Curated annotation (Swiss-Prot):
NCBIfam families noted in UniProt: PRK09257.1
Modified residues (N6-acetyllysine): 59, 73, 82, 90, 107, 122, 159, 185, 234, 279, 296, 302, 309, 338, 345, 363-364, 387, 396, 404
Name this polypeptide is given: Aspartate aminotransferase, mitochondrial
Cofactor requirements of the protein: pyridoxal 5'-phosphate
Keyword Phosphoprotein listed: yes
BP terms from Gene Ontology: 2-oxoglutarate metabolic process; aspartate biosynthetic process; aspartate catabolic process; aspartate metabolic process; fatty acid transport; glutamate catabolic process to aspartate; glutamate metabolic process; malate-aspartate shuttle
Biological role: Catalyzes the irreversible transamination of the L-tryptophan metabolite L-kynurenine to form kynurenic acid (KA). As a member of the malate-aspartate shuttle, it has a key role in the intracellular NAD(H) redox balance. Is important for metabolite exchange between mitochondria and cytosol, and for amino acid metabolism. Facilitates cellular uptake of long-chain free fatty acids.
Organism phylogeny: Eukaryota, Metazoa, Chordata, Craniata, Vertebrata
Remaining remarks: In eukaryotes there are cytoplasmic, mitochondrial and chloroplastic isozymes.
The organism of origin for this protein: Pongo abelii
Chain positions found as Asymmetric dimethylarginine: 313
EC numbers: 2.6.1.1, 2.6.1.7
Length: 430
């Protein structure tokens, strides 16, 4: 009994003499997370789960953001297989990468984005760090803004934008605003609305721009429109934050897809840039990306680099090794790079071809609607203009799965199912 009177009674002994204490202790131990609510399912992953449960042999999954070949199968680029074989033959170690990543990968990524003859590269007034794909690049950039962009907390996103943009910037401590971008009447770019809204954005705010193949709409500004946007950005002294997840994958030409980024820099606008190799190299699960900041001079770039490393260290310490080695091998080996560029163009051309076939099949079905926006849009995704109730019918009656906003992944369309898709769309829109 001495233990009970010492004021330091063992919990088990005290509980034996006081059943109420046992119940209270049990309640305390089991109720840490009773306040945690069930979160909503991811809308795109939810589409995939519903697709998997469907037993219809004609079912189509047009929600997934990954390339598929014309048989509807995942595609590993032959250049990636070659790079993997070359790397394996070297019997390399698995040591940690530096905080900023694989140096030869970072250098090659900057060259791919900005152009090999870029003044920025020659002067050294930039920093590139390897990131955990495009999402990681965005988060590193957002966290850097939160810590060092002293002018504003507002980030202006196009309406609509990739669904992950909002939580990435919000969770980093930034505030989200919007500007007009997509015109549902034309299923095209609302150029007038975009320029009007950007012209009214408070000076020294952050403007997020999709460099090419806008997700989710597939609607991109034309070069002359980009020029006017750049003029407004420069006049309003806005910070241009580019997300470039589809270089080469949009048009089949990497230089063409990077045109907007390069034009802004040529106009004296110091941008930051997020890159991903998920789509254009098919390295989805390898998580290969880069974040680049264009600075005033080389000294500023070194200071920014030091702070980016300080941000990265407590997040994940070092980026993954394998995917960066693959990408670096492809970008830095002339024959592999040439092969890769041809393969990227092949993927882009297949998607462009599927757009054309879909419109052709809709006409064959007798549709009198104007479907030109399907071929006008670019990249993996197409904003069909379908209404939520029409999407619901496609899912229930035809087992064609997509997100409620009518966005489809054209990469999921093949020459064997494009006719079925056109028939179904015609049935719900006639």
């Amino acid at each position: 009994m001495a233990l009970l009177h010492s004021g330091r009674a063992l919990p088990g002994i005290a509980a034996a003499f006081h059943p109420g204490l046992a119940a209270a202790a049990s309640a305390r131990a089991s109720s840490w997370w009773t306040h945690v609510e069930m979160g909503p399912p991811d809308p795109i992953l939810g589409v995939t789960e519903a697709f998997k449960r469907d037993t219809n042999s004609k079912k189509m999954n047009l929600g997934v953001g990954a390339y598929r070949d014309d048989n509807g199968k995942p595609y590993v680029l032959p250049s990636v297989r070659k790079a993997e074989a070359q790397i394996a033959a070297k019997n390399l170690d698995k040591e940690y990468l530096p905080i900023g990543g694989l140096a030869e990968f970072c250098k090659a990524s900057a060259e791919l984005a900005l152009g090999e003859n870029s003044e920025v590269l020659k002067s050294g007034r930039f920093v590139t760090v390897q990131t955990i794909s495009g999402t990681g690049a965005l988060r590193i950039g957002a966290s850097f803004l939160q810590r060092f962009f002293k002018f504003s907390r507002d980030v202006f996103l196009p309406k609509p934008s990739w669904g992950n943009h909002t939580p990435i910037f919000r969770d980093a401590g930034m505030q989200l605003q919007g500007y007009r971008y997509y015109d549902p009447k034309t299923c095209g770019f609302d150029f007038t609305g975009a320029v009007e809204d950007i012209s009214k954005i408070p000076e020294q705010s952050v403007l997020l721009l999709h460099a090419c193949a806008h997700n989710p709409t597939g609607v991109d500004p034309r070069p002359e429109q980009w020029k006017e946007i750049a003029t407004v950005v420069k006049k309003r002294n806005l910070f241009a934050f580019f997300d470039m997840a589809y270089q080469g994958f949009a048009s089949g030409d990497g230089d063409k897809d990077a045109w907007a980024v390069r034009h802004f820099i040529e106009q004296g606008i110091n941008v930051c840039l997020c890159q991903s190799y998920a789509k254009n190299m098919g390295l989805y699960g390898e998580r290969v990306g880069a974040f680049t900041m264009v600075c005033k001079d080389a000294d500023e770039a070194k200071r920014v680099e030091s702070q980016l490393k300080i941000l990265i260290r407590p997040m994940y310490s070092n980026p993954p090794l394998n995917g960066a080695r693959i990408a670096a091998a492809i970008l830095n080996t002339p024959d592999l790079r040439k092969q890769w560029l041809q393969e990227v163009k092949g993927m882009a051309d297949r998607i462009i071809g599927m757009r054309t076939q879909l419109v052709s099949n809709l006409k064959k079905e007798g549709s009198t609607h104007n479907w030109q926006h399907i071929t006008d849009q670019i990249g993996m995704f197409c904003f069909t203009g379908l209404k939520p109730e029409q999407v619901e019918r496609l899912i229930k009656e035809f087992s064609i799965y997509m997100t409620k906003d009518g966005r489809i992944s054209v990469a999921g369309v093949t020459s064997s199912n494009v006719g079925y898709l056109a028939h179904a769309i015609h049935q719900v829109t006639k």
